[in-house]
Amino acid sequence: MSARPQADFDGKAFAARLSTAPGVYRMYAADDSLLYVGKAGALRKRVGSYFNGTPKNARLTSMLSQVARMDVTVTRSEAEALLLENQLIKSLSPRYNVSLRDDKSYPYVLLTREDWPRIALHRGPRAVNGRYFGPYAGVTAVRETLNLMHKLFKLRSCEDSVFRNRSRPCLQYQIGRCSAPCVDLVAAQDYQEAVRRATMFLEGKSDQLGEEIMHSMQQASEALEFERAARLRDLLSSLRSMQNRQYVDGRAADLDVLACATQSSQACVLLLSFRDGRNLGTRSFFPKTNGEDSAEEILAAFVSQYYAEHAPPREILLDREIPDAELIEAALSAAAEHKVALKWNVRGERAGYLLLASRNAQLTLVTELTSQSAQHARSEALREMLGLAEQVKRVECFDISHTMGEATVASCVVFDASGPVRGQYRRFNISGITPGDDYAAMRQAIERRFRRAVEENGVLPDVLLIDGGAGQLAQAQAALADLGIENVLLVGVAKGEERRAGHEALILADGRELRPGAASPALQFIQQVRDEAHRFAITGHRGRRQKARMTSKLEDIPGIGPRRRASLLKHFGGLVGLKAAGEAEIARVEGVNAALAARIYANLHGLALPDAAGESSP
């Protein structure tokens, strides 16, 4: 059901037409932007409560004054309404809802779904088909887990392109960390069993897994399968050893601890996780709030939204009672297909965990606010130095990175008054220019970034920093002029005397030059943005350069065409395997004679190339 926009929306009349069924309601402004999404056990009663004439707080009063229309979706239950509400908040980001910011930056353990699953570290969107375990507190924790997985279960970690083209086992097999499914050294049934056990381990079921392995070991021994029994014994021993090293508290076997701190219209939710008694560390989240949401409301929204995306443990400790706790508990239990308990009145060790999480949430929030305050002060100093009338809301910076003209990459980083906005960073692979021409590279990057903004009516920065002197600045200025963009302030950041930090010169589009000095907060802000652009550019350049060099080594050898190159890489499982081979071994590849093998070996090892006469490239 939906009401179309009206000058004075009659919410009371709209509510009277609703049913008493559970569902989700949405409020829209006159420009059709979404203001708020809410759930209701009874739509008529809940929606009507907004328009019953009773006094409302400032946030609600402001929101309701903007409502031009509403619509609703009826659901079968209030629990279903809760799930739909979470999905809509995540996908639509309504202005007045508490919203959990995306946590794509946190790393996961990925176990792919394919005939021969691989296990690997994953960060970013979940585009790969598989199970994602986590998120973990950091990359180190993921690598420790992967190390255990390889030792215990010998699952592959190689990319599919390498896996499909190997003809002999890799080093991981030689050191006992992979079962070499790439060359059929493990039966499919045995590999799938290892995958199943690894899944149990990652789900926090190591005790159950240990009992299962012990039972299988006893069965193998009774059946006189002593070799299999010995392998299972070693696996069980490794598992027990790992448990003894990492066990923290048997009573915290599968547990999350959540605490919420609020201050100055901002909030921090701190998550402390235990899985199978192992402390996985803490993660901090800063939900988007409206300044008037209570800590209880923020924590309730966090629990609903976070566990809609991540598998909940059986027990979740909260530092305070939250609204709709029973409903949220029921919804989480139904989705997880096991009982999930939300608790806040706890004693003993668990009370200690809550106290620890609460203190850390407060400390983390204070640290974040202090950092934001300093960042805002620097942003304000930049505004004053550049003589801008309004606050600097968005700064972008471009930098170019290459090695003697090779693999040129341009970076664009974005900052607002609170710091970096990493989700909006961009890299541009530069092509079609004279190698080493930084001016042309800068112009191409600026044109590509801002042409799209013009075509899609995208956001423009208030200040555009160019890492370079007057030449690079002129190229950026010309590119913007060609696109008809005039309301962006351009600033070139030229290196100072002896390239020393703090001595940079800021070159404006009108030719003026500013030298604010090392103590200037404005220059410190610019340095921070410029250094981040440099880091982002050089990281992209190194990746592109490495990829180009890996693929071009064979292409540079006379007598190696596409078919021979593919045969060589397939035979040796990649360039690393080929480089480790001797001339005689290379010559055994179909289509490669001794002379060509000698040239391949010489090229890969930096030796003088033999004469290529008489060879052709198939």
Swiss-Prot record:
A molecular function (GO) term: DNA binding
Biological source species: Xanthomonas campestris pv. campestris (strain ATCC 33913 / DSM 3586 / NCPPB 528 / LMG 568 / P 25)
GO terms for biological process, alphabetical: DNA damage response; nucleotide-excision repair; SOS response
NCBIfam families hit by this protein: uvrC
Keyword DNA damage: yes
Domain GIY-YIG: 20-98
Name of the protein described by the UniProt record: UvrABC system protein C
InterPro entries to which the protein is assigned, alphabetical: GIY-YIG_endonuc, GIY-YIG_endonuc_sf, GIY-YIG_UvrC_Cho, Hlx-hairpin-Hlx_DNA-bd_motif, RuvA_2-like, UVR_dom, UVR_dom_sf, UvrABC_protein_C
Keywords attached to this entry: Cytoplasm, DNA damage, DNA excision, DNA repair, Excision nuclease, SOS response
Transmembrane region(s): none
Quaternary context: Interacts with UvrB in an incision complex.
Functional summary from the UniProt entry: The UvrABC repair system catalyzes the recognition and processing of DNA lesions. UvrC both incises the 5' and 3' sides of the lesion. The N-terminal half is responsible for the 3' incision and the C-terminal half is responsible for the 5' incision.
Gene: uvrC
Keyword Cell inner membrane part of the UniProt annotation: no
